[in-house]
């Protein structure tokens, strides 16, 4: 199990974003063997008619023997989440009551053309799960309804016994026997979900990778809060990823000092910013004791480019080059992303 990826690859059409996911991220970074474990790769495409029901799950009518019945069909996210839980269960050492992290297979949910659907409506409350802690689990949990929770349990292999009122009475997941709810909760405590209150978290072995064509950015608006939950990787027109290696800040105090100066820079350019109150950056915008250059580039610099200075890039031009007449040097985010080292040094000395 590797560190989870939560990233949107973006760039012009035809730059090889999907190819990069299939040929590099899935086999090399996530170590998923598509030939051996195809169930660990779940793909979908967002479009204007794609809904929360397609993503999470929905009740659909079917006719059997002349009678109409309703079945709940899981969506792409629920299927990916259940598969990730299932892989954790299969790596759980029931004798020593511990997880063997190195044995847990990764799962990836791939969303093509994420901005062609109404992302905020499609994700719904799942948006809350996109915040991850240092362990890779969601920082917060959400509650889901009984039908959705039962479907997750079915997908991971749980069998149910029902009482005379049609309510679930006992749960069975091999090698455990059939047990009551409280006992079953204790047996599955390592999955970080609450059977009684029906709460879930995204586990660290579930990555979400999406693609977005910049030419389609106006199809559906993606709000800043949604964008901040992702890393952004720009794919240039030559199909190369602009991603710098190395550590930018080796400690939290260094990072926090940098953020204070960055906010001073942002406030000094308030005339170029609409709604400056929510355009400043908090200390936990990027988490971890060490801050990588790639995170500065793909998350922080993208936020500045796309959300803070989206109306006017002159403050960034002035910061990097000291001359506002060099606007031609900073046309695309790719141009800005190339300047990660210069950007860091300029903010440090601001």
Where do the protein language model's features map onto the residues?
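C-terminal regulatory/interaction module of P-loop NTP-utilizing enzymes
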Residues: 1-350
């Amino acid at each position: 199990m590797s560190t989870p990826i939560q990233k949107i690859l973006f760039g012009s059409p035809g730059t090889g974003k999907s190819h990069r996911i299939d040929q590099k991220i899935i086999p090399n970074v996530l170590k998923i063997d598509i030939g051996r474990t195809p169930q660990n790769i779940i793909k979908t495409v967002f479009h204007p008619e794609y809904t929360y029901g397609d993503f999470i799950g929905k009740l659909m009518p079917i006719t059997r023997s002349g009678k109409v019945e309703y079945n709940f069909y899981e969506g792409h996210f629920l299927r990916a989440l259940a598969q990730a839980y299932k892989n954790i269960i299969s790596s759980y050492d029931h004798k020593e009551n511990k997880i063997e992290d190195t044995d847990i297979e990764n799962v990836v949910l791939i969303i093509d053309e994420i901005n062609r659907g109404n992302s905020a409506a499609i994700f719904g409350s799942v948006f809350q799960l996109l915040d991850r802690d240092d362990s890779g689990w969601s920082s917060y949990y959400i509650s889901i309804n009984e039908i959705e929770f039962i479907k997750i349990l079915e997908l991971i292999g749980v069998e149910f016994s029902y009482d005379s009122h049609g309510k679930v009475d006992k749960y069975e997941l091999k090698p455990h026997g059939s047990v009551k709810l409280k006992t079953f909760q204790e047996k599955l405590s390592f999955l970080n979900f609450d059977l009684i209150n029906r709460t879930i978290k995204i586990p660290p072995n579930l990555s979400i990778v999406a693609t977005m064509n910049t030419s389609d950015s106006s199809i559906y608006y993606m709000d800043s809060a949604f964008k901040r939950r992702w890393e952004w990787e720009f794919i240039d027109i030559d199909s190369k990823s602009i991603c710098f290696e190395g550590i930018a800040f080796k400690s939290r105090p260094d990072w926090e000092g940098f953020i204070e100066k960055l906010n001073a820079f942002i406030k000094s350019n308030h005339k170029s910013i609409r709604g400056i109150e929510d355009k400043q950056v908090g200390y936990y915008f990027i988490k971890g004791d060490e801050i990588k250059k790639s995170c500065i580039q793909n998350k922080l610099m993208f936020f500045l480019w796309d959300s803070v200075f989206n109306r006017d890039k002159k403050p960034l031009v002035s910061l990097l080059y000291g001359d506002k007449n060099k606007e031609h040097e900073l046309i695309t985010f790719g141009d800005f992303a190339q300047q990660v080292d210069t950007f860091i040094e300029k903010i440090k000395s601001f």
